[in-house]
Amino acid sequence: MYPTSIFQSAELSIDDKNKLNMVINHLLFLMRIKSVSLYEHSQRVSNLAAATAIYMRLTANEITLIRNAGLLHDIGLICVPNHVLTNYPYVSKRDIQVYKRHPDLGANILESCPGMEDLIPLIRFHHERWDGTGYPKHLKKILSLIHI
């Protein structure tokens, strides 16, 4: 039986790792074109998340998943207009709603990338909060690796 996600496989082939890294690098390239500060933010989040995962003694696959989630957590912002991205939160209520769609937009981007299935919920729900005040779904009592 084949894993549904490349993150589920304990032994990834070099070809699979190369494909994953190529897709991630292409997405990061698009992010950097959109905004250097957004790209740099994602690098910092990824480094901090990976360091935390290592400290927690998670498995190599979990560390890779968390590192990649940190890199791509805001990939949906490439779909948000520049004036909203650069002025948030000092924008209209309508533009705030556009901005708050970025987790879903990012998850939708990853849905078209084979092997990224494990990343999708981490991207989609990274702004959810325990008390339901997060977005985009206002979920309550959700706790994931992203919040640990």
Listing of model-derived features with the role each one plays in the protein:
Residues 1-147:
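Histidine- and acidic-residue-rich, metal-dependent catalytic cores
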